[in-house]
Amino acid sequence: MGIPVVVPVAAAYSCSSSLAAPPRAAAAAARAPSRAHVAAAGMSSRASSFVGGSGGDLAAVAASVAARPRRAGSGGGGALGCKCLFGLGVPELAVIAGVAALVFGPKQLPEIGRSIGKTVKSFQQAAKEFETELKKEPGEGGDQPPPATPTAVSGGEEKGLEASSSKESA
């Protein structure tokens, strides 16, 4: 048996489950959470048994806390917590800028910044052109007439052409 770390919280959760199931089933469910609850807590069954002793109350509490709906504003926000570029926050970008300043020096940084800006601008322009071409393609298919196919010449016209060419050569 593991040491009950958060007994009042676990007792509150076991009371709500005891209303729906017999006391023995509720106790068994509290001791051995289902795989879905363990997966929702982000733990494997081996890790849940390590953390909660025999997979007991602590794993059940962790699973119920992980399954709770979160507020919209609590997604790691805050002044320094925004994920701006490729999942990097403000502190990470500041460290990258500091390392770049040390590596390239103050004379080359403006030139590198300009070249990066031009590259980003060209990528944005190419993406915009690609998007407009994708929007145009479905509408263009019905407006254009089908391409002209060459028609076969009938046998009578060929004989007439041969006769006129033989008259000219004679």
Curated annotation (Swiss-Prot):
GO terms for biological process: protein import into chloroplast thylakoid membrane; protein transport by the Tat complex. Residues 106-170 are stromal. InterPro entries: TatA/B/E, TatA/E. GO terms for molecular function: proton motive force dependent protein transmembrane transporter activity. Residues 130-139 have a biased composition (Basic and acidic residues). Residues 62-84 are lumenal. This is Sec-independent protein translocase protein TATA, chloroplastic.
